[in-house]
């Protein structure tokens, strides 16, 4: 009896393995049929088709596909993709679980995917975690949904407020809010700071960034001691870390029971955030919306669209605010990384402070966004952090069968954009493993940049006559194409304001810089990261 049971179990297991392997191999061998373009024309002949084989790649195993190949690259999967490119070329296929994947590893291929084929490569992975984060439906998220007319409408609605142009009224509003919030931040830090003692300033940095976003988008500011506010700032940071991690569950959904506790935690984070947005922001604001008055902020625009557009629901508003207010976590983590590299290299901090001191001179004011163009080294440092951390671009998904670089790509294929290879290749950068902001600077062809008062920056140091390089084609921190990051100007602007206003007042150091551990390939830092020593500057201008 026992022997029969064992044989039955073995037979079932072998059957599962065989079925899995057959399905995987079918996915690997399947060819893509595409209509042939008529000779010397861009017109398509729908009566003639050509078969395209898929890009080469390693043979997958049953059940797990090629996931085992990344096992030794757990902390740096895109470094694993780069290593595999040495064997299989700049474009190759992988199978994760039963899901076909394509990895593109050079600039020309990335542009072909994101620009030339942006329409058919506009989907997002259908990961269970993505659904759990957004109320059971990832289409609620602007960043994680597939492309659609509703998605385009939401982007258009957000663009005016969330992509402020330089010197526009929204740009000036962002500058004022950022500077005022850093005054609150400085007072709060003064209550916590013990001279010479390290402090974990990440929670305080995140609160300041969260208030900048909530004031800019909702015209509401929250006290740092507000318990509910503290909680949602923490949960936003946890979610930012979560989205930047990979889990076997993403490709092996049968592992779901083992992730139930973790997924419940994710659901709790996101539902708590949405409850806060509903009770503390939307209910507070919807009673005062006036269709005849100009929009005060993004929340006004959303509430008006709720009244005027039948395709916009209350849930649409809640999820859009969750998406965009959550952008503060990216800013906070970026700032922490900048401060970490300053603590590791005091010369970087010194040069940033030289730019600051040259601009404010004897003026009684904080640095603002109008000073950004006169502070090329500071911006170069922020860009070098973005390059060095090489945060992954959210994967794309083929929404129909297509062809990339002569290879067939089947519908549903997940496409990984390997910007890590762009950021670390000696083809594009001199000594790419070295952290060096100067790589983003070049000799200025113009006079010294003007500050917000119209005077020369007057920097008498190595920063003299340097300007920020523009349009570096292989530097894509915010992606390109249809799904480029719509909030990148907010990230740059608020990130700049926090960094310079911290450096204007404090010297940043660490008792032991070697203990500052930074994960590769990620902008996200764990909630409990590294402490820093903030020493008030002896000379900070009249402030």
UniProtKB/Swiss-Prot annotation:
EC code: 1.14.-.-
Lineage top rank: taxon: Eukaryota
Protein name according to UniProt: Cytochrome P450 307a1
One Pfam assignment: p450
Gene3D superfamilies: Cytochrome P450 (1.10.630.10)
Entry's Gene Ontology molecular function annotations: heme binding; iron ion binding; monooxygenase activity; oxidoreductase activity; oxidoreductase activity, acting on paired donors, with incorporation or reduction of molecular oxygen
Protein species of origin: Drosophila melanogaster (Fruit fly)
Record's miscellaneous remark: Member of the Halloween gene group.
Keyword entries, A-Z: Developmental protein, Endoplasmic reticulum, Heme, Iron, Membrane, Metal-binding, Microsome, Monooxygenase, Oxidoreductase, Phosphoprotein
């Amino acid at each position: 009896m026992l022997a029969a049971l064992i044989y039955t179990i073995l037979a079932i297991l072998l059957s599962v393995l065989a079925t899995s392997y057959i399905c995987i191999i079918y996915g690997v061998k399947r060819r893509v049929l595409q209509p042939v373009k008529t000779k010397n024309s861009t017109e398509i002949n729908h009566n003639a088709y050509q078969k395209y084989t898929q890009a080469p790649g390693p043979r997958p195993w049953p059940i797990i596909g090629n996931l085992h190949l990344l096992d030794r690259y757990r902390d740096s999967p895109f470094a694993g993709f780069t290593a595999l490119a040495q064997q299989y070329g700049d474009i190759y296929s992988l199978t994760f679980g039963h899901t076909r994947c394509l990895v593109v590893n050079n600039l020309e291929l990335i542009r072909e995917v994101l620009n030339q084929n942006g329409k058919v490569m506009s989907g997002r992975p259908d990961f269970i975690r993505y659904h759990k984060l957004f109320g059971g439906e990832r289409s609620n998220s602007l960043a994680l949904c597939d492309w659609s007319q509703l998605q385009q409408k939401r982007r258009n609605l957000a663009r005016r407020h969330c992509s402020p142009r330089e010197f526009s009224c929204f740009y000036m509003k962002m500058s004022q809010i950022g500077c005022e919030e850093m005054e609150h931040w400085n007072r709060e830090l003064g209550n916590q700071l013990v001279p010479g003692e390290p402090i974990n300033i990440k929670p305080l940095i995140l609160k300041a960034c969260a208030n900048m976003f909530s004031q800019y988008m909702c015209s509401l500011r929250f006290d740092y001691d507000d318990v509910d506010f503290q909680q949602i700032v923490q949960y936003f940071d946890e979610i930012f870390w979560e989205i930047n991690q990979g889990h076997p569950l993403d490709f092996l959904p049968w592992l779901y029971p083992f992730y139930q506790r973790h997924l419940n935690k994710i659901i709790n984070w996101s539902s708590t955030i949405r409850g806060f947005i509903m009770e503390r922001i939307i209910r507070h604001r919807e009673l005062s919306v006036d269709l005849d008055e100009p929009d005060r902020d993004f929340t006004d625009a959303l509430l008006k669209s709720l009244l005027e557009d039948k395709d916009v629901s209350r849930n649409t508003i809640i999820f859009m605010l969750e998406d965009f207010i959550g952008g503060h976590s990216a800013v906070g983590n970026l700032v922490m990384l900048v401060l970490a590299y300053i603590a590791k290299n005091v010369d970087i901090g010194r040069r940033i402070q030289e730019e600051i001191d040259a601009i404010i001179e004897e003026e009684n004011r904080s640095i603002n966004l109008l000073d950004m163009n006169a502070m090329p080294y500071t911006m170069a440092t922020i860009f070098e952090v973005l390059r060095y951390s090489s945060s992954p671009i959210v994967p794309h998904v083929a929404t129909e069968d297509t062809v990339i670089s002569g290879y067939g790509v089947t519908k549903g294929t997940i496409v990984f954009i390997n910007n890590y290879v762009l950021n670390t290749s000696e083809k594009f950068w001199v000594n790419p493993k070295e952290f060096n902001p100067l790589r983003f600077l070049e000799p200025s062809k113009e006079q010294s940049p003007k500050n917000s008062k119209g005077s020369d920056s007057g920097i008498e140091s190595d920063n003299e006559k340097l300007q920020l390089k523009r349009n570096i084609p292989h530097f894509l921190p915010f992606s390109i194409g249809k799904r480029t990051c719509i909030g990148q100007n907010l990230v740059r602007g608020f990130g700049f304001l926090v960094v310079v206003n911290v450096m204007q007042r404090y010297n940043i150091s660490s008792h032991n810089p070697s203990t500052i551990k930074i994960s590769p390939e990620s902008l996200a830092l764990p909630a409990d990261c590294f402490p820093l020593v903030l020493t008030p500057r002896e000379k900070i201008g009249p402030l």
